[in-house]
Amino acid sequence: MLKKTLTNFITPSDPPHVHYAAHLAYITSLSGTTDSEESGPYSPSNASLRALGAIRDLHSLATRNSHTEVALFALVLELRDLVHNGVWNRVGESLLNVEKELKLTAEFDPAKPPTTIGTSNLEKVLVVHVLIIGVLYYTHTGDYANSQPRIKKLHDMLDGAALDAFGPSGIIDIHLPNSPPLTVQVTHPRIIFTLGFLVSSVSKRDPVGRKPKRKLFAQEGVLIVDKELKKEFPCKSRFNFL
């Protein structure tokens, strides 16, 4: 139904935010149709392949329109989709590409001068998501040398008020020239805060010792989860894309 809407009802005269919202709704519908009971080694389902194709269509549209932030959003959606579906042999290349586009590469190279990253709220949000995925990927592959600079940068950003970019509930606007903004729901900031502790716990190498950091981060993360489970917060799922 959503595919027909994209093909037959969305016209070139419609404003950009309408086009992008329709694409994102279609991507979300495809992402939610993956067989959750599938077990064993990864094999791409028709739904996941269609979702990946739909994400790339969104990226192509945003690139043609010179809407850089929407294109960046699509790149991070693709990276997230690959991780979600366990396509680890393609995550590395996608991660490096996204990090380059977000100007994160220089942050992990001591020989290069630091650059300004996350100049807008959306970019800060995307950087935080990409850092979390990067830590998980390099921990998964056993690459401690690449995992640690990313966890350090993640800590720096979370300690430096990067969560403010998420707003009170993770609803942010992607501003478009001469058009109303595209409103999307990203991960709730309280969930990001909790993930910061839990991701840190799995990325540390010191599971034993007098004060093992892995244990400290894990304990703090679990305590936060317990507290958050007792609270309620609004989440408008109709905007939920990342």
Give the positions of each predicted feature.
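Extended alpha-helical scaffold regions
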Residues: 1-242
